[in-house]
Amino acid sequence: MLFMCHQRVMKKEAEEKLKAEELRRARAAADIPIIWILGGPGCGKGTQCAKIVEKYGFTHLSSGDLLRNEVASGSDKGRQLQAVMASGGLVSNDEVLSLLNDAITRAKGSSKGFLIDGYPRQKNQGIEFEARIAPADLALYFECSEDTMVQRIMARAAASAVKRDDDNEKTIRARLLTFKQNTNAILELYEPKTLTINAERDVDDIFLEVVQAIDCVLKKKQQNAAAQC
């Protein structure tokens, strides 16, 4: 009888420890900022991401890089993704979300924050990201005029050793039109958590505005953590 009672006590203690650990992990995850980095090609968001990583030590995740890395790994999933892309098809949002979720899960224990670069590209992707992974704390939209982006893309293409058939003004403007339509829907839905930044200024001036926004997010996180203690 005493042995069975002891077992019940041990089991209850183990369950309480497990619940405490789950609560600790949930609070830790909630304390890690997630920031969406939005902007058209040539807007300079890559430069700003590098500066954010240098200052804050955040983890920079690009959906494109994750796809390429998975293909390069030679895994079963990588071979499946390669087959889809080689056929000219689009990788499903479920696959992209799965890669993002895996990357966030792997880095969550040591990361100070996450920059999700170039995602979401469509409104439904943002909705699914927040439902399946976590709510974004902030969306930074680096706004650039179409003419400026065209000039930057074409200059970058001219300097590249690899030439692409679609690096012409007509095709670029068509891509930018699609981007603008999709982005407008995202900005409308997530307006309360979005900061639109004029990306046609000096890099350091842009970064000052970025820093103010991120510092505000971090301050709120700290206040929430203190309130839970």
Swiss-Prot record:
For this protein, the record's InterPro entries field holds: Adenylat/UMP-CMP_kin, Adenylat_kinase_CS, AK1/5, P-loop_NTPase
Keywords (alphabetical) are: ATP-binding, Cytoplasm, Kinase, Nucleotide-binding, Phosphoprotein, Transferase
Pfam families linked to this entry = ADK
Keyword Transport present in the record's keywords: the answer is no
EC number(s) stated in the UniProt entry for this protein: 2.7.4.3
> What is the documented disruption phenotype for this protein?
RNAi-mediated knockdown has no effect on viability.
Q: Where in the cell is it found?
A: Cytoplasm
- Gene Ontology cellular component annotations, sorted alphabetically: cytoplasm; cytosol; nucleus
Top-rank taxon: Eukaryota
UniProt note on tissues of expression: High expression levels in the thorax, suggesting a possible function in the gastrointestinal or reproductive systems.
Any Gene Ontology biological process: ATP metabolic process
**Which residues are recorded as binding ATP?**
G42, C43, G44, K45, G46, T47, R156
PROSITE patterns noted in UniProt:
ADENYLATE_KINASE
Q: Where are residues bearing Phosphoserine located in the sequence? A: S62
Q: Which reaction does it catalyse?
A: AMP + ATP = 2 ADP
State the Gene Ontology terms under molecular function.
adenylate kinase activity; ATP binding; UMP kinase activity; UMP/dUMP kinase activity
Name the family.
Belongs to the adenylate kinase family. AK1 subfamily.
Known function: Catalyzes the reversible transfer of the terminal phosphate group between ATP and AMP. Plays an important role in cellular energy homeostasis and in adenine nucleotide metabolism.
The identity of this protein, by name, is Adenylate kinase 1
Species of the source: Drosophila melanogaster
